[in-house]
C-alpha cells in the first residue's frame, strides 16, 4: 500500500490541474468533515487565514447565513457531515461548497446547484488527502484573495522524496514494540495526522499531545517504569519543543522546509509511509478496515434513520 503514498506527487498535480467551480467571496468559512475528511480542515488552521474560520468535526454545527460552508465527505454518505449540511441549510446558509466522490452529498450538491469538487473513487479516505487539501487551498485563494502557491505541495514531495522516505523508515523502526506519542506545538495537526495514520494503517495504538501543555503534566510519565512502553516523538517548531525532546529522549522529526505548504505535504508523506512500513512489519493489511465501517453504519442509522 506504500505505492499509494508514492503516487502523492501525481495526486497533487492532478488536483492542481483540475477545473474548480467559481466560488463567491467569503466573509466567514466553516469546514464540515470528520476522520480522513476532517484532518484537512484541521491542517488548514496552519495557514494564515484572512477570514473567520470554524471547524466542525461533528454533526453539531453552529453557523449563520453569511458563512461559506465547505462540506467534505469522501464517500458522500458520512452521517455527521450530511447532518451538518442539513442543519446549515436550516440556518439559512446559501453557499455550500461540496468536496466528495459521490453518494448522498453529491446528490445534494447537484440538486441544489452547490459548487462541487469531485474526488477520485476507489481509495480509503486517508489516501486522498492531496486532493482534498489542494482543493481547500485553491478555494481559499479564490474566495479570500489569498495567494498560496499550490505548486509548493508538489515540491514538498519531489524536492526531497528520498530523504522523506528514509525518515519514514527510521520512524517505523523506532515505533516497533513501543506506543508512540507524537508531540507538537504550532504543528499540532501534523502530530495528529501521524497518530491517525498509525492507527488506521497499522492498526496500532498511537496518541498525540500538545506542547507546551504536556510539559506541565504528561511528560512526568517518562520518569516511571510505565513510561518505558511509550516512545515520544516530537515535531519541533521552537526551542521549547527541542528542550522537551532532549529532556525525555524523544525521537525528532524536523520539518524540512521553510514553506508551510511544502512542510504539510512532506510531513504527511512521512506519516503515511511510516505507517504502512510499520503495518508491513506487523504483517497487517494497511488498506483494510474492519471496525470503522461498522461504527459508520451505526452512526448513520442513529443520525439519519435506517
Swiss-Prot record:
UniProt-listed Pfam families: bact-PGI_C (PF10432), SIS (PF01380)
Top EC class of this enzyme: isomerase
Domain of life of the organism encoding this protein: Archaea
Catalytic activity: D-glucosamine 6-phosphate = D-galactosamine 6-phosphate
SUPFAM superfamilies in UniProt: SIS domain
CDD domains: SIS_PGI_PMI_1 (cd05017), SIS_PGI_PMI_2 (cd05637)
Catalytic residue list: 200, 216, 296
Transmembrane segments: none
UniProt-listed Enzyme Commission number(s): 5.1.3.42
Function text: Involved in the synthesis of UDP-N-acetylgalactosamine (UDP-GalNAc). Catalyzes the conversion of glucosamine-6-phosphate (GlcN-6-P) to galactosamine-6-phosphate (GalN-6-P).
Protein name in UniProt: D-glucosamine-6-phosphate 4-epimerase
Amino acid at each position: 500500500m506504500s505505492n499509494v503514498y508514492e503516487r502523492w506527487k501525481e495526486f497533487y498535480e492532478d488536483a492542481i490541474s483540475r477545473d474548480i467551480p467559481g466560488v463567491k467571496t467569503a466573509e466567514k468559512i466553516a469546514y464540515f468533515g470528520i476522520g480522513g475528511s476532517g484532518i484537512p480542515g484541521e491542517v488548514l488552521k496552519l495557514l494564515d487565514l484572512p477570514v473567520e474560520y470554524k471547524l466542525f468535526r461533528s454533526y453539531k454545527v453552529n453557523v449563520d447565513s453569511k458563512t461559506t460552508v465547505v462540506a467534505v465527505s469522501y464517500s458522500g454518505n458520512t452521517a455527521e457531515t450530511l447532518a451538518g449540511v442539513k442543519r446549515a441549510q436550516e440556518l439559512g446558509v446559501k453557499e455550500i461548497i461540496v468536496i466528495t466522490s459521490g453518494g448522498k452529498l453529491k446528490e445534494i450538491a447537484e440538486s441544489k446547484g452547490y459548487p462541487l469538487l469531485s474526488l477520485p473513487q476507489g481509495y480509503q479516505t486517508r489516501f486522498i488527502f492531496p486532493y482534498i487539501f489542494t482543493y481547500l487551498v485553491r478555494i481559499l485563494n479564490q474566495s479570500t484573495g489569498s495567494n498560496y502557491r499550490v505548486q509548493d505541495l508538489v515540491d514538498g514531495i519531489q524536492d526531497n522524496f528520498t530523504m522523506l522516505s528514509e525518515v519514514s523508515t527510521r520512524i517505523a523502526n523506532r515505533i516497533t514494540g513501543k506506543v508512540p506519542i507524537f508531540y507538537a506545538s504550532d504543528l499540532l495537526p501534523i502530530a495528529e495526522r501521524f497518530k491517525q495514520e498509525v492507527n488506521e494503517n497499522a492498526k496500532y495504538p498511537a496518541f498525540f499531545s500538545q506542547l507546551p501543555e504536556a510539559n506541565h503534566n504528561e511528560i512526568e510519565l517518562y520518569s516511571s517504569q510505565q513510561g518505558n512502553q511509550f516512545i515520544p516523538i516530537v515535531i519541533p517548531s521552537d526551542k521549547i519543543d527541542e528542550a522537551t525532546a532532549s529532556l525525555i529522549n524523544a525521537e525528532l522529526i524536523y520539518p524540512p522546509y521553510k514553506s508551510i505548504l511544502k512542510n504539510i505535504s512532506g510531513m504527511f508523506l512521512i506519516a503515511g509511509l511510516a505507517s504502512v512500513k510499520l503495518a508491513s512489519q506487523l504483517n497487517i493489511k494497511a488498506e483494510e478496515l474492519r471496525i470503522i465501517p461498522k461504527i459508520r453504519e451505526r452512526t448513520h442509522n442513529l443520525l439519519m434513520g435506517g
